[in-house]
């Protein structure tokens, strides 16, 4: 089924503008001993994985709320055992984190897209999906929108998940710790594919994932201050991602994805929560 719906793009005057992406300016490769490379004058970045090591990079900026997008083309062919990630994370032992994780699979089998939200080091809010396209054939855009009211995960402009701020119910929500954007390609064949039953085929190495089109509309955190001083006050900025929510059309698209492509939802896993489902699940 063709996907024609795109979420509206909102601009704000008090955020960093989404100028043309340039990896040389916006990110730094943090590990991999040369396996991560910036190419084409900063327009393309590749990560590779072999038996010795994977690789990764991070944004130079920290954000306290933002809308971060990346075009990615995942490892083709037999990617079993590999994990490609795009996420926001704060440092420390009680960290906040918002995850996209792409779990590789055997040739011809679809990737699993794993999402999760951590607050103060506590996660357990997983939702997993199969994608409705081949994520290795072309670049596709993955976006995390994080504002004081909600977190929205989108794929090519189509929302797949919304995690609302339900602190009124006692549910933790990440809103106090600035986070960087991170991405990595690494070996996780002890769990990534069929619970670790399928191992990485190192004869296919090096495995490579490609990135372009990094966009950051965000409240940049620098020297203990935000570029959006009123961002934590809900509803103070209208007409931007800081107050963006899903309209009825977007909600319909999200329900279509969840109905047809969601393969795991912690909110329906009664065996995992014998004392009762999390409160935010009952309120949804």
From Swiss-Prot:
It catalyses: breaks a beta-(1->4) bond in the backbone of a xyloglucan and transfers the xyloglucanyl segment on to O-4 of the non-reducing terminal glucose residue of an acceptor, which can be a xyloglucan or an oligosaccharide of xyloglucan. Disulfide bonds join 219-228, 267-281. SUPFAM superfamilies: Concanavalin A-like lectins/glucanases (SSF49899). Keywords: Apoplast, Cell wall, Cell wall biogenesis/degradation, Disulfide bond, Glycoprotein, Glycosidase, Hydrolase, Secreted, Signal, Transferase. Glycans are attached at residues 105, 230. Its EC number is 2.4.1.207. Residues 1-21 form the signal peptide. It holds the Pfam family XET_C. The active site is at 97 (nucleophile), 101 (proton donor). Highly expressed. Predominantly expressed in green siliques. Expressed in young expanding leaves, trichomes, lateral root primordia, vascular tissue, abscission zones and elongating hypocols. Following wind stimulation, it decreases in the leaves of wind-stimulated plants, while it strongly increases in sites around cells of the pith parenchyma, between the vascular elements, and within the epidermis. Optimum pH is 6.0-6.5. Induction: In response to mechanical perturbations such as wind or touch. Induced by auxin and brassinolide. GO terms for biological process: cell wall biogenesis; cellular response to hypoxia; plant-type cell wall organization; response to auxin; response to brassinosteroid; response to cold; response to heat; response to mechanical stimulus. Belongs to the glycosyl hydrolase 16 family. XTH group 2 subfamily. Catalyzes xyloglucan endohydrolysis (XEH) and/or endotransglycosylation (XET). Cleaves and religates xyloglucan polymers, an essential constituent of the primary cell wall, and thereby participates in cell wall construction of growing tissues. Its induction in case of mechanical stress, suggests that it may contribute in the adaptive changes in morphogenesis by being recruited to alter tissues tensil strength, or flexibility, enabling adaptation to mechanically stressful environments. This is Xyloglucan endotransglucosylase/hydrolase protein 22. It comes from Arabidopsis thaliana. The lineage of its organism: Eukaryota, Viridiplantae, Streptophyta, Embryophyta, Tracheophyta. The gene is XTH22.
């Amino acid at each position: 089924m063709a996907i024609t719906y795109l979420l509206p793009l909102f601009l704000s005057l008090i955020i960093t503008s989404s100028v043309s992406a340039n990896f040389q300016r916006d990110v730094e490769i943090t590990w991999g001993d040369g396996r991560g490379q910036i190419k084409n004058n900063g327009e393309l970045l590749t990560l590779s994985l072999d038996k010795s090591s994977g690789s990764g990079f991070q944004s130079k900026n920290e954000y306290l709320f933002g809308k971060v997008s990346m075009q990615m083309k995942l490892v083709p062919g037999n990617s079993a055992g590999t994990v490609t990630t795009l996420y926001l994370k704060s440092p420390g032992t009680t960290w906040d984190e918002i995850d996209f994780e792409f779990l590789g699979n055997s040739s011809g089998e679809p990737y699993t897209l794993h999402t999760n939200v951590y607050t103060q080091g506590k996660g357990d809010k997983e939702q997993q999906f199969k994608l409705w396209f081949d994520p290795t054939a072309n670049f596709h855009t993955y976006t995390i929108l994080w504002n004081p009211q909600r977190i929205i995960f989108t794929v090519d402009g189509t929302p797949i998940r919304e995690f609302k701020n339900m602190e009124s119910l006692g549910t933790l929500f990440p809103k106090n710790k600035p986070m960087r954007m991170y991405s990595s390609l690494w070996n996780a064949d002890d769990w990534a594919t069929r619970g670790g039953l399928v191992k990485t085929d190192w004869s296919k190495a090096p495995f490579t994932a490609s990135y372009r089109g990094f966009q950051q509309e965000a409240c940049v955190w620098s020297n203990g201050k935000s570029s959006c001083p009123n961002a934590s006050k809900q509803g103070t900025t209208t007409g931007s991602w800081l107050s963006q929510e899903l309209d009825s059309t977007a909600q319909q698209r999200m329900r279509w994805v969840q109905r047809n492509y969601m393969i795991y939802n912690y909110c329906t896993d009664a065996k995992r929560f014998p004392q009762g489902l999390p409160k935010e699940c009952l309120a949804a």
